[in-house]
Amino acid sequence: MNFNLKDLIEFYDSELGKISVISIQEKLHRFLDTKLKQNVLGFGYIIPYLRKKDIASKINFLSIPSTNNKIKYYRNELNASLEVDETSLPFNDLEFDKVFVSHWLEVSDRLDLVISELWRVLKGQGKIIFIIPNSFSLWSNIENNPFGKCRPFSKSQIKKLLNLQGFEEIKVEFCLYFPPYNYKLLVKNHKLIENIGRALFRNMGGVMVIEATKFNYAIPKKQLKAYRYIFPKVSLQQ
């Protein structure tokens, strides 16, 4: 599948994209919020969610998988970015306390390898957070948004995939209950619609925000015996 950066940028610059970020950020804040100093890796396209400073401050490194797109690196005083090979991350084993993944799992053709590589760089009992399109939603069936142009997952599918790759204690929350249209009335009342949708259609939100914990004794299956690093390994330890 294709990682279309232009489509993502255009969507998140639209009114629909902006209210989508607001709804997703409310869930992210719960999973990323911590008073502890932690190493957190952002993987995929997570730039829209960094506009909220309290979320951006939790993430100290952005890792953007290599594509045919010309990617403009994102830099500010809080985050640094690097383009990487999705199956051979240039980080040490057990490097990060948390990994936050957005707009990649649903477009990658090498799911097992990607997840096992993210498992490798997580510390013991580390947490991984995904934003994943929900297959039982209107959003995944309309192509005017990035969640409708990729491979969606059901709650049971993503749980099974993560279990097989060495993750447990999987928590799933839903958001984006308002329909994916740029109507002024909808945009104005998106919070009300979101609350009604959550109450009436709990498992039908457009996006799943998922947190899973690394299972220390599991060894994810890899289809390759070894990987060649195309960048020097990066350590975040001072």
Regions found by a protein language model. Name each.
Residues 112-127:
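A short glycine-rich, Lys/Arg-flanked "PGG" loop and its adjoining helix->strand segment in the class I
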Residues 26, 34-88:
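Class I SAM-dependent methyltransferase SAM/SAH-binding core
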Residues 1-33:
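Class I SAM-dependent methyltransferase Rossmann-like catalytic core
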Residues 194-238:
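C-terminal lobe and adjacent flexible extensions of AdoMet/dcAdoMet transferase-like proteins
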Residues 84-99:
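A short acidic, Gly/Pro-enriched loop at the edge of an enzyme's catalytic core
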Residues 133-149:
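Short, glycine-/aromatic-enriched active-site segment of Class I SAM-dependent methyltransferases
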Residues 170-195, 203-205:
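Conserved catalytic loop of SAM-dependent methyltransferase domains
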Residues 149-172, 176:
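Short alpha-helix
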